[in-house]
Amino acid sequence: MPPRRNTRKAATKLRSSCAAASTLDLVGDKWSLLVVRDLLHGKRTYGEILRSPEGIPTNILADRLARLEQVGIIESAAYQERPVRYAYTLTPKGRDLGDVVLALVRWGKKHIPGTRSLTEK
């Protein structure tokens, strides 16, 4: 399989040395933690993540996958040659965000009526 080419900048610019601000610089946009959530719940491919109920636009999903890979939160491996398609998995650094996602779920269930976790039907 051909290697995945990363055409993005080598580093993400951080606003300050504050750990909270720096973390938000990496994953604080509207979509990144939802991609992490989907990977935590077993989704692996672009198409699987794209079908999530929030309706992430295709260009945004491609950008977030590339950015999360660039900062070491996810990694990709080609599973098909023509056309080349990738499966995504969380790195140990990415799996460490599981507690953050869980904290958001707990907060939402407590403070936003009608919300639930993905595992609840």
Predicted regions mapped to residue ranges:
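N-terminal leader segment of winged-helix/HTH proteins
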Residues: 1-27
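Short loop/turn motifs at secondary-structure junctions and domain boundaries
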Residues: 14, 79-80
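N-terminal helix-turn-helix DNA-binding core of bacterial DNA-binding proteins
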Residues: 18-60, 81, 89
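Basic, amphipathic "hinge/linker" alpha-helix immediately C-terminal to the N-terminal HTH DNA-binding motif
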Residues: 28, 80-103
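Basic amphipathic alpha-helical segments that dock to polyanions
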Residues: 61-71
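Amphipathic alpha-helical dimerization/coiled-coil segments
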Residues: 98-121
